[in-house]
Swiss-Prot record:
Belongs to the GroES chaperonin family. Keywords: Chaperone, Cytoplasm. InterPro entries: Chaperonin_GroES, Chaperonin_GroES_sf, Chaprnonin_Cpn10_CS, GroES-like_sf. Heptamer of 7 subunits arranged in a ring. Interacts with the chaperonin GroEL. One of its GO terms (cellular component) is cytoplasm. This is Co-chaperonin GroES 2. One of its GO terms (molecular function) is unfolded protein binding. The lineage of its organism: Bacteria, Pseudomonadati, Pseudomonadota, Gammaproteobacteria, Vibrionales. CDD domains: cpn10 (cd00320). Transmembrane segments: none annotated. GO terms for biological process: chaperone cofactor-dependent protein refolding. The gene is groES2. It is found in: Cytoplasm. NCBIfam families: PRK00364.1-1.
Length: 96
């Protein structure tokens, strides 16, 4: 991959949602909501602070996250694959 996030940004690969309902019915692609879970594939160096240091990033490459899929999330295709670019503040939780 040839994309590198800056500051407090993350590059995330969206994880697929299961296409079956709780009752076992197979759902069409129009019926399936986009997943708000993803795998972090790249992490920026952290937000620059006034004193010249950088804020420590809590999210690491390889983490599985739950994120807020809202206004600030950008989608970018790299080498034919779709990635999300989001801020660390858009991360709601790390799945352990």
């Amino acid at each position: 991959m040839n994309i590198r996030p800056l500051h407090d940004k993350l590059i995330v690969e969206r994880l697929e949602v299961e296409n079956k309902s709780e009752g076992g019915i197979v759902l069409t692609s129009q019926s399936v909501k986009k997943s708000n879970r993803g795998k972090v594939v790249a992490v920026g160096l952290g937000r620059p602070l006034k004193n010249g240091d950088r804020a420590r990033m809590e999210v690491k490459t390889g983490d599985q996250i739950i994120f807020n899929d809202g206004y600030g999330v950008k989608t970018e295709k790299v080498d034919g694959k779709e990635y999300l670019i989001l801020s660390e503040s858009d991360v709601l939780a790390i799945v352990e």
